């Protein structure tokens, strides 16, 4: 068993899909990490470009066993399903002090990315699930700085995690307990892997660590699976334009997925979930009562006003 004095082993999960244009930068940033004890497990999602060849060439230059390819499931399954397949593959082999980090194919990690996550998670009890996320430097396709992702104004917790995702996948790192929790669960169809991890860990009483130091150059370009709005005000405006249908559909789906796995949740989370379910089945009075639940809110007043409107009418 690993001791606290030993550096944590990091298992990096990488899902590739037609990412040849940017992969070399990301792989080089893994080699530049000041936390040296990592291994990479990757899966290609049916790329039509040289993505798989680029990662394989990288693997050939590493020590034997440091890079491993997962061949299943075959074909194109999408980003979320690909990452969850990788997580399930590695979860049982994790040691007590090991951590898992998601890596997007088109970003660049700053050299201290892993070490900050490892240090933050090491300060918490190993037996409790914990998930780490950090701010990002938003850059264009050529790595020119655009802005820095906003600070979180409200502590991330459940049930706020039902209303929006605050765990940006390219920064997410989980301890063994969180990784096994998520790997053993069933995510709702279409839910991004990072949001599901954040949602489930917080509903299960785990810790969410939000690092205010940016640790990733997060590329914004036309082929991102999911981009990052530069401010929470823009997120609120984007939600307003989409209307209540999409948002409330996602909310109901996530509520149903948690309800189907109630045994994983804390008693408090189960009670909160039941109140939200009653509100979604009921009329205005029940919905107004649910909106008074502590923590059922989004990050800013603009986002919160949109959320309240959609919750009442959607």
Protein language model regions, located:
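Nucleotide-sugar donor-binding/catalytic module of glycosyltransferases
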Residues: 2-230, 314
């Amino acid at each position: 068993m690993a001791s606290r004095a030993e550096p944590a082993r990091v298992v990096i999960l990488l899902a590739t899909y037609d990412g040849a244009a940017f992969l070399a930068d990301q792989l080089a940033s893994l080699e530049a990490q000041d936390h040296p004890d990592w291994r990479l497990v990757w899966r290609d999602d049916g790329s039509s470009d040289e993505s798989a060849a680029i990662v394989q060439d990288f693997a050939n230059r590493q020590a034997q066993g440091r890079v491993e390819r997962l061949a299943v499931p075959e074909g194109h399954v999408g980003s979320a399903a690909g990452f969850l397949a990788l997580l399930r593959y590695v979860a049982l082999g994790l040691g007590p002090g090991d951590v898992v980090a998601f890596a997007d194919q088109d970003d660049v990690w700053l050299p201290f990315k892993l070490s900050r996550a490892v240090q933050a998670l090491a300060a918490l009890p190993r037996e409790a699930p914990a998930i780490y996320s950090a701010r990002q430097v938003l850059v264009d396709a050529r790595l020119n700085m655009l802005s820095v992702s906003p600070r979180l104004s409200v502590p991330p917790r459940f049930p706020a995690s039902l209303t929006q995702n605050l765990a940006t996948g390219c920064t997410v790192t989980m301890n063994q307990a969180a990784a096994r929790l998520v790997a053993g669960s069933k995510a709702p169809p279409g839910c991004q892997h990072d949001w599901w991890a954040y949602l489930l860990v917080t509903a299960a009483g785990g810790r969410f660590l939000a690092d205010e130091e940016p640790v990733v150059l997060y590329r914004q370009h036309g082929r991102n699976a999911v981009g990052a709005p530069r401010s929470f005000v823009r997120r609120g405006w984007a939600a307003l334009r989409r209307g209540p249908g999409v948002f409330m559909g996602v909310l109901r789906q996530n509520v149903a997925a948690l309800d189907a796995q109630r045994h994983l949740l804390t008693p408090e989370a189960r009670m909160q979930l039941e109140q939200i379910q009653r509100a979604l089945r009921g009329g205005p009075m029940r919905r107004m009562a649910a909106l008074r639940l502590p923590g059922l809110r989004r990050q800013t007043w603009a986002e919160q006003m949109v959320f309240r409107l959609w919750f009442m009418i959607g």
